Amino acid sequence: MSNFSIKIADLPVGISCTHPHLSDVCSEYLTDEAPLFSVGADEEHKEELRKFFLGSSQVFSDDFLESVAVQEKVCAAVLDYDAAVFHAALISFDGQGIAFAAPSGTGKTTHIKLWQRLYGDRVEIINGDKPLFTLRSGRFFASGMPWCGKENWGCNKTVPLKAICFIDRAEHNLISPLEDNREIMSRLFLQLVMPEEHRLMVKYLDFANKLINTVPFYLLRCNMELSAAQTAHDGIFGIE
């Protein structure tokens, strides 16, 4: 058994694990600070995950299942600290965070790569799959997490959250602000990393409601051409 601490955003977290894979995943986030809470993966949790993945064509190792189990426990525990994890691809553009959200296969990964091609070093991928959002003194911030999707795109940084942009595939590029909170919530609900415990579920939905009423939301209908990134940029930041 190995024990170590990591720091995600401003939250120090204690980790217990039996496989070196997890410490490798978390290596960029190690800290000496005393943890606010600690998590580990028990055998029952790993067995539940093993059954969940049973229909997959892949065979998942025990160290992978341990990493997923710990990730799920972290996602639940942070809700007690005005923080929540969402399914999204988070980039930093000139130091400001933009989160792109869409169902799997829509093209989030392709879209953030277009931003990199168009804007170069002005763009940094903070987390390609599950960033952490935090609410601090009335402002939302977005941070990297050790777990960042199959591409493993991410870094240990925190940026102010400028906007959240939903992506729909379309032939032509068009971005528009979303102002109907019911539509925003219906789209955002698909991106929630929902905990099982009712108490934490209530906290998650309250956090999401505050997010909707604080951060600008957009709907980007786009293709996979470079001009899609230009359209998104101009809609969020204005034409340079």
Q: Over which residues does each language-model region extend?
A:
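A noncatalytic interaction/capping subdomain that flanks phosphate/NTP-handling catalytic cores
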Residues: 1-104, 114-124, 132-240
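Conserved lysine of the Walker
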Residues: 108
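Hydrophobic positions on the alpha1 helix immediately C-terminal to the Walker A/P-loop
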Residues: 111
